[in-house]
Amino acid sequence: MRATREAFGEHLPVMGEKHRDIVALDADLGKATKVASFRESHPERFFQMGIAEANMIGVASGISEYGYKVFMASFGSFLTGRYDQIRCSLAYSNRPVVLVGTHVGMAIGKDGVTQMGLEDVSIMRALPNMKILNPASYSEAIKVIEYLCETELDSPYYLRLGRQPVEDWDMPFEFGKGQVIADGEDITIFATGCILGDVFEASKIIEETTSMSVRVVNMPTLKPIDEEIIVECAESTNMLFTVEDHSVVGGLGSAVSDVLTEHFPAKLSKIGLNDVFPESAPPADLYEKYGLSANKIAERVISESMG
């Protein structure tokens, strides 16, 4: 089990050797976000900006004007706190900059709500030009980083990474596409990011305790969302659920709901943080209290599907 932030720390320097146009910026959190590893291998293309995310965003925009691809890293909650700079200097200016937000969701546990990225997807989804990636595993994060480094970016990206070690799902990655990782005919559960393992475990609990079969769909790209797979699942299964370690307001659930409203009205239940601020506690305790543990996800799906 490995964290998605580790993939960033280990693979960005590798890609930096291959692509000399990659630059990395740090906001004094390099050991936590893992961007510090880029300084060790490519010090001439690494810049320490200090505790100054707003300035870092402006600098990243300026550097990108000279043909460089900039990766800038901080905690997701700290980046989104600089919304005006992101909006004007990156989204409005449409700069090829990758905002890397780590330590997202309740999974950071005892660090508390001020450090948890719980509304980051909502905020980034609202920005024109911004694209959003949320890999579920170390291996998928490697593929996402390769995509970002080897693609000629035409807009800013938000890359959402977790602190907690998770099961290493080795899945094919295609930008803008979801992947069916377990097929079923009765229920579809869409998941994004590091909670995928809990969702997969929940699907097994459901199948072992009921007669229902569960389709689990991984959604690593949150914007643009894969409309085709959402409609296909709505047409072929009886009920849809979304699960995310994020607020249910504006996240994966809202993105799926938007697609269904326009293209195929269907019943959808959103599982996530229900418009509240959680406490500071061990991640497992928070997941249990707020309905994101495998058992709680299974209970909710069974209750709403059979009720």
Residues covered by each model-derived region:
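Thiamine diphosphate
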Residues: 1-158, 165, ...
